[in-house]
Amino acid sequence: MMEGLKKRTRKAFGIRKKEKDTDSTGSPDRDGMQPSPHEPPYHSKAECAREGGKKASKKSNGAPNGFYAEIDWERYNSPELDEEGYSIRPEEPGSTKGKHFYSSSESEEEEESHKKFNIKIKPLQSKDVLKNAATVDELKASIGNIALSPSPVRKSPRRSPGAIKRNLSSEEVARPRRSTPTPELTSKKPLDDTLALAPLFGPPLESAFDEQKTEVLLDQPEIWGSGQPINPSMESPKLARPFPTGTPPPLPPKAVPATPPRTGSPLTVATGNDQAATEAKIEKLPSISDLDSIFGPVLSPKSVAVNTEEKWVHFSDASPEHVTPELTPREKVVTPPAASDIPADSPAPGPPGPPGSAGPPGPPGPRHVPSPLNLEEVQKKVAEQTFIKDDYLETLSSPKECGLGQRATPPPPPPPTYRTVVSSPGPGSGSGTGTASGASSPARPATPLVPCSSTTPPPPPPRPPSRPKLPPGKPGVGDVSRPFSPPIHSSSPPPIAPLARAESTSSISSTNSLSAATTPTVENEQPSLVWFDRGKFYLTFEGSSRGPSPLTMGAQDTLPVAAAFTETVNAYFKGADPSKCIVKITGEMVLSFPAGITRHFANNPSPAALTFRVINSSRLEHVLPNPQLLCCDNTQNDANTKEFWVNMPNLMTHLKKVSEQKPQATYYNVDMLKYQVSAQGIQSTPLNLAVNWRCEPGSTDLRIDYKYNTDAMTTAVALNNVQFLVPIDGGVTKLQAVLPPAVWNAEQQRILWKIPDISQKSENGGVGSLLARFQLSEGPSKPSPLVVQFTSEGSTLSGCDIELVGAGYRFSLIKKRFAAGKYLADN
């Protein structure tokens, strides 16, 4: 049979006839394709198919003789019929495979022919698969169309679509033809998809990262704003000669020694575009109400209302001689739902004490010094940070002054950023936004401040490290209560203590930790314990030895309690004159309880009274205990120690309420004390500053001198993440010299220096200078205030410490930190 195949010399697409074995006209049985090895010779009706195959107009593929490029699919869908109505067989191989409708007298010959055919085709098939991978896909698509196309006439059982699809796949590989139109190859789709989706989803991620980078450290995103990078070519070229050229800028005598440029800690130059977020938030930042001559009054009450992230309850530092009316709008604006939680039968707060006569923290002179600052300019040009501890404790003489003013002002809702992860933001989380409130929540009654004594049983044995969970029914140890604390079974239920903020307690688990972009954790000695953000500290217990998990203990175990002192220093430096430095330091002490303590209190309704003593308190002034939770003995003779005990019924009620509102919480932070530290001018600032400007029409020279001051701290600790930000106006066209390297934001016209840490171990003992020269097109520049930010942990500026008195509780952690509030320096 193969003899007839070799007689054909015509080629189709360069393929020899012997490769196209099904195109012979001399063998009717091979008109279309090789028969199946099981296919017998055709008789009766099959003869019509052979006769029809010999006619030039009836080729099996619907094309004239010698043309084998395209298949006439219409012919397959509507096959020709013979005189009796049978369709003429198209001579396709395998179409009747497995269907024996005829005799098998020639089955052996057909099988042998098929074997020879397979021997010849297999190498061609593998070769063509490699060369014509796309053609295979096209043919598969075409065959699929055949299988899905219904025939309008009676189908022949020999034309099974499955058989055609199954047997033609290998045959079509050996017979490459001009394919019918098919969709685009998939190899082109990735590029096309990228181009099509680019306008919808924006540029690729790489370009987004190239265009958006944070300009400053993540501690204060709203201060510096988010930024965009600057090309290295835009960076100011360094001069070959030392800066400044010629005579350095004249500096007045100063307490801060001028030293050579600090180059020990160069910073990576990367700029940012932080205009939108920064300007929007600057408009919302409330200013501190004291030091009005320096920082100015609140510009817009509505801006305070919009800024939900800063709507904390503050202590008011308004003295009777000037109760700032700026706080009144804040009272009207902040109306969280916590007010509804206060029962109507709560005891009335104690009567307000006589007006205090204490003076402001700083020297009285600065009150009358004309302010060199324009607050609007400061808030619009300088990215300020809100430090919420700056509004309270200025002249209150006693905790009783927190009187009735706070009843009308419920605590504000928590900021969305910390609602699920923070329990009690630190220094900024003062209490009631009322005019003269030292409490941390409205309607917080004043507990009688009467001295009392109590006898406490010997302390129980220490809890084993394994923390076995004992039966809850066992009696508690140290079941002592203060005689002046309201009994648990009082006729009127104890008032609910929402404390400072509605979110005063919340989950602090590491799984839902804050995002690094807004509230990073400053890790030093114990990671993830306390983090600082916008002038506030936040306390967690991740990393502490015995407090990271919910409480599981028996009735005889001592309850773990953690404490955190967080302080904020606000300072204003005028030139290099130390006598003009105004300083204000505020702080707060927070206690944190594990969530499991509520179950312990439920099983032990009369727990031991929690008593603690604040030591080294001689530098504290205007100490304001939480009047709803704390009792204080004011008759103590020791001026360096203050003892407090907790109103346990109120504490239990508050913790139970919070546990119901926030069942996911792991720890509950409770504000206990607010205080102000007696400041001694520039000696109380951990970082002394002096700024000098030399403004000319064509250029501006800026020099910033700083000095690390160990005398301001009880324990010398490093200042971390120090940032210096200065706006420069006048149309800066070029940075001629910057030492050490800094970040220049061309759009915001601001320069930023970042120093990882400053301490005694730094170059020159923490003394250094920052220098910059700017070429101007619209000079001269107008001097702008310098804004400085830093954090520090491991010490406080007040030197306070805490210790427990009595049994039943133990401190699992005591944390101390401080940070810069409004830390400004002017020319």
Swiss-Prot record:
Phosphothreonine found at: T180, T182, T247, T259, T324, T328, T335, T409
GO MF annotations in UniProt: microtubule binding; phospholipid binding; SH3 domain binding; tubulin binding
Record's subcellular location: Membrane, Clathrin-coated pit
Annotated tissue distribution: Specifically expressed in brain (at protein level).
Annotated spans, Necessary and sufficient to mediate interaction with CANX: 648-827
Region (Interaction with DPF motifs-containing proteins): 560-566, 592-594, 666-669, 812-817
Composition bias type Low complexity, residue spans: 336-345, 436-455, 481-491, 498-521
Positions of the UniProt region annotated as Disordered: 1-115, 142-205, 223-278, 314-523
Residue spans of biased composition, Pro residues class: 245-260, 346-369, 456-474
Membrane topology per record: Peripheral membrane protein
Basic and acidic residues bias: start-end ranges: 16-32, 40-54, 314-333, 377-392
Biased composition annotated in UniProt, kind: Polar residues: 265-276
One GO process term, biological-process aspect: response to starvation
Domain MHD stretches: 558-826
Example of a GO cellular component annotation carried by this entry: cytoplasm
Modified residues (Phosphoserine): 78, 104-105, 107, 149, 151, 156, 169, 236, 265, 287, 289, 300, 316, 319, 371, 398, 485
Keywords for the protein's UniProt record, in alphabetical order: Coated pit, Endocytosis, Membrane, Phosphoprotein
Subunit record text: Interacts with proteins essential or regulating the formation of functional clathrin-coated pits. Interacts with CANX. Interacts with AP2A1. Interacts with EPS15. Interacts with SH3GL3. Interacts with AMPH. Interacts with ITSN1 (via SH3 domains). Interacts with and REPS1.
Known role: May function in clathrin-mediated endocytosis. Has both a membrane binding/tubulating activity and the ability to recruit proteins essential to the formation of functional clathrin-coated pits. Has a preference for membranes enriched in phosphatidylserine and phosphoinositides and is required for the endocytosis of the transferrin receptor. May also bind tubulin. May play a role in the regulation of energy homeostasis.
Protein name: SH3-containing GRB2-like protein 3-interacting protein 1
UniProt source species: Rattus norvegicus
